[in-house]
């Protein structure tokens, strides 16, 4: 089992503006394991970016304890490292942002090399390092291009290479794909996954998009108004969201709400027979491999008319979502519901026939 590389314990962050006190983060505890791709999701103003800046103490918390890679960096209201040790610790943490923050007058390779200006490497070693980093992010052929000559995705690749220049153990991505088109976003997420696998890099993803969490993360924390309201594996959160905000994020990411709107306009649903009901079936893991609807027809003579179906792969595990009309004798439908529950399927009745 991997150990926690980032431990944020009971973090409070308070700002004072004139006569107002703003509680940006309230008693948040997050532990992130080595090798995780960990998502922190929430709407603008939720406190997620403020929280993540305490990892490298770009933002000092008001209260709480921070441990990074085994070292306590902040406790009892004070930074626990010397200035030199803090600088070294920050080198272990790379950051990328929505706006790429590249220097317009420097080429791609010069932007990456800038991050090595305090490195103990020789000039030749630095040059080799820059070439290796640009190859790693798939941009070696653009080494001599200036930012103005690069697309948004290419600029972000340069920013990623620069963030990796000092061989960090942790990479923080603060809305790094927000300015990119969907195709480029997928390419950047695929690159981050590859870096996670190749380098054993721990990645913290700050985002307002649950789709990104679904595509890349293995664990997720949901924040609202400075409070962590839900946390767990992506599989658990998507399979069984407990909080209303989490459910809202997930329905947006899966498109189930939009599907239901269209389904409710269909004649079969508008005029549901007395011996039928509209149900949503959610299932995960081995349940997705079983011919469950065929099984309930054979056992209970309950037919299933599939109006919507979707299977996602979350952290290597298939997760299914289906909207069906179940039709049969009332007692048989009850028996079929029970059989589905016993097979690990969550059954929600959306409408009963009149």
Swiss-Prot record:
Catalyzed reactions per annotation: L-methionine(out) + ATP + H2O = L-methionine(in) + ADP + phosphate + H(+); D-methionine(out) + ATP + H2O = D-methionine(in) + ADP + phosphate + H(+)
Keyword check for Cell membrane: yes
EC number: 7.4.2.11
All residue ranges annotated as the ABC transporter domain in the record: 8-250
Binding site for ATP: 42-49
UniProt cross-references to Gene3D superfamilies, sorted A to Z: 3.30.70.260, P-loop containing nucleotide triphosphate hydrolases (3.40.50.300)
CDD domains: ABC_MetN_methionine_transporter
Record localization: Cell membrane
Protein family according to the UniProt entry: Belongs to the ABC transporter superfamily. Methionine importer (TC 3.A.1.24) family.
Enzyme superclass (EC): translocase
Main location per the UniProt record: membrane
PROSITE patterns named in the record: ABC_TRANSPORTER_1, ABC_TRANSPORTER_2, METN
InterPro entries according to UniProt: AAA+_ATPase, ABC_transporter-like_ATP-bd, ABC_transporter-like_CS, ACT-like_dom_sf, MetN_ABC, MetN_ABC_transporter-like, NIL_domain, P-loop_NTPase
Record-given protein name: Methionine import ATP-binding protein MetN
Keywords carried by this UniProt record: Amino-acid transport, ATP-binding, Cell membrane, Membrane, Nucleotide-binding, Translocase, Transport
């Amino acid at each position: 089992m991997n150990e926690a590389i980032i431990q944020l314990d009971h973090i409070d962050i308070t700002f004072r503006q004139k006569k107002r006190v703003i509680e940006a983060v309230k008693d948040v505890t997050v532990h992130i394991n080595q090798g995780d791709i960990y998502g922190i999701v929430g709407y603008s103003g939720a406190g997620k970016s403020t929280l993540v800046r305490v990892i490298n103490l770009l933002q000092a918390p008001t209260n709480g304890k921070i441990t990074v890679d085994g070292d306590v960096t902040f406790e009892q209201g004070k930074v626990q490292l010397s200035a030199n040790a803090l600088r070294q610790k920050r080198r272990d943490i790379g950051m990328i942002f929505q706006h790429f923050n590249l220097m317009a007058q420097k080429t791609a390779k010069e932007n990456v090399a800038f991050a090595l200006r305090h490195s103990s490497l020789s000039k030749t070693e630095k040059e080799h390092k820059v070439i290796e980093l640009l190859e790693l992010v798939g941009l070696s052929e653009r080494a001599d291009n200036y930012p103005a000559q690069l697309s948004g995705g290419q600029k972000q690749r340069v920013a990623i290479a620069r963030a990796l220049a000092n061989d960090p153990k942790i990479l923080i991505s603060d809305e790094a794909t927000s300015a990119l088109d969907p195709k480029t976003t997928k390419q950047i997420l695929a690159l981050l996954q590859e870096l996670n696998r190749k380098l054993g890099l721990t990645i913290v993803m700050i985002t307002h998009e649950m789709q990104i969490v679904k595509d890349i993360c293995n664990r997720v924390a949901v924040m609202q108004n400075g409070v962590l309201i839900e946390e767990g594996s992506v599989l658990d959160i998507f399979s069984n969201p407990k909080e209303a905000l989490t459910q809202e994020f997930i329905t947006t990411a899966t498109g189930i709400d939009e599907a239901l709107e269209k389904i409710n306009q269909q004649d079969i649903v508008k005029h549901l027979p007395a011996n039928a009901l509209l149900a949503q079936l959610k299932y995960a893991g081995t349940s997705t491999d079983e011919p469950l609807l065929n099984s309930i027809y054979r056992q209970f003579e309950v037919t299933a008319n599939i109006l919507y179906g979707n299977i996602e792969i979350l952290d290597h595990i298939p997760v299914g979502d289906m909207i069906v009309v179940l039709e049969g004798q009332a007692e048989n439908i009850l028996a079929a519901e029970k059989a589905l529950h016993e097979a690990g399927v969550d059954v929600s009745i959306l409408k009963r026939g009149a």
